[in-house]
A protein has these predicted regions:
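A short glycine/serine-rich beta->alpha loop
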Residues: 29-35, 233
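Short, well-ordered secondary-structure "scaffold" segments embedded in the functional core
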Residues: 49, 58-258
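Short secondary-structure boundary/capping segments within folded domains
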Residues: 6-8, 34-37, 48
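Charged, often Cys/His-bearing segments associated with DNA-binding zinc-finger transcription factors
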Residues: 1-31
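Short, amphipathic alpha-helical "recognition" segments used to contact nucleic acids or chromatin
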Residues: 38-52
Length: 258
């Protein structure tokens, strides 16, 4: 199924999404000035914004409208997408059910944003930039199963994982993670404290863990082909959660066609 690089969906996927959104939102105004963009145009503008993180003034110029028109279209479409694709959302319970007895992998990733003077807690010392952090879970085939809601960029991966209330649900028997999750009860590499050296068993365990962890990095990279997730988010932080939910649901919606 050929994907349109501009909007991140195939023609079939876009048609299905358009029908769902059309049922979820009343786009044409009954009073006041008519909208400058049709529903189809507004949806494509929003998908283009998600896929490429193009500035709104450039999108406005491309479509012959003002920047506020683009801003309004994106704000409305984000909420409409969240409503239209709600069935594709996944809870932690859904993950455990889908995974069954399979081993899964977890990792955290920072989604960068502009540095706001009134939001110092967005600063990540690990990444040396500002953003929102998310927890990702995939299976050993690299199939993405879950993405958590955003937390502040300053939040350590172990703390973010514990806030999911996932301890006990995932253990060293069914989840692999990196050293950032030591103490969370999942399988992690053994840390070489004070360079005292590792035993042969420790080295074999570390090799096993590191050999299987690459799949989560691949899953995260695939999600971040929505460039809005990979490059700086420029809008106000108050809009981030809705935008993220829309992109996450779009990604799982797209996966349902595989």
């Amino acid at each position: 199924m050929r994907t349109n690089r501009t909007i991140g969906l195939s023609d079939v996927q876009f048609s299905e999404l358009y029908e769902r959104v059309a049922r979820s939102v009343s786009w044409d105004k009954k009073k006041g000035r008519p909208r400058r963009l049709s529903l189809r145009q507004a949806l494509k503008v929003t998908l283009t914004y998600f896929k490429n993180n193009i500035t709104q003034d450039v999108l406005a110029e491309l479509h012959g409208v003002s920047q506020p028109v683009i801003s309004d279209a994106i704000a409305v479409m984000e909420k409409a997408i969240v409503q239209a694709l709600g069935e594709f959302d996944r809870s932690l319970e859904d993950v455990t059910e889908a995974a069954g007895n399979r081993v899964v992998v977890v990792d955290g990733s920072l989604h960068p944003c502009w540095s706001w003077a009134d939001q110092p807690s967005l600063w990540s010392g690990k990444h040396q930039r500002t953003g929102h952090s998310h927890q990702y879970i995939c299976d050993l085939n690299g199939v993405l199963l879950f993405i958590s809601d955003p937390v502040l960029g300053s939040t350590h991966d172990a703390k973010a994982f514990k806030e999911l209330n996932a301890e006990g649900v995932f253990t060293s028997q069914n989840m692999i993670a990196d050293k950032g999750y030591i103490g969370c009860g999942v399988l992690t590499p053994v840390k070489n404290y004070r360079n005292k050296g590792l035993t042969t068993n420790d080295e074999e365990l570390n090799t096993f863990v590191n050999k299987h962890r690459y799949v989560i990095e691949r899953s995260i990279a695939n999600f971040k082909t929505w460039r809005i997730m990979h490059t700086d988010y420029r809008r106000k932080t108050s809009t981030y959660a809705t935008m993220f939910s829309a992109v996450k649901l779009l990604h799982f919606f797209r996966m349902s066609f595989l």
